């Protein structure tokens, strides 16, 4: 992935569309909206940090994983909308209005409401072989227009529970 590809992916996840303008401005806006501070380092280091915080679950739950856990706990569904819309919808559902602040602070406040802690209680686990996970397509597929490399969005059709835990 190029720097612009990674940055655009994070922007689409957070805002719903890739932003335009100089990379430096786009990086600064994401950092400000996400944590409220600008980080030090090279452009690529900063983009990788934003990308990893959004998608990587290897050291801690990613923003997407946290949002999925919050939404499922609060409304028993997980939306395919952008993060900005998902946070807003949950705040209106919980508080009756939207809050101000960074994505991080808003997610922490929702987590305190849902779980009694700013930290969402998630643990990594291994899904046993042959575990059935039913999925439903989000987008209508047309075999005539479908080609290798196309993104096909899907969602869980049913909850997958293992040892009393919901698996994401």
Regions from the PLM with identified roles:
Residues 16, 37, 77, 97, ...:
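Short beta-strands and strand-coil junctions in structured, solvent-facing domains, enriched
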Residues 134-135, 143-168:
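Structural recognition of beta-strand segments within beta-rich domains
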Residues 30, 90, 127-130, 137, ...:
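Buried hydrophobic packing residues in well-ordered domains
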Residues 25, 122, 128-132, 147-151:
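Extracytoplasmic
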Residues 1-115:
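Alpha-helical, heptad-rich or low-complexity scaffold/stalk segments
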Residues 116-123:
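Short boundary/loop segments of OB/S1/cold-shock single-stranded nucleic-acid-binding domains
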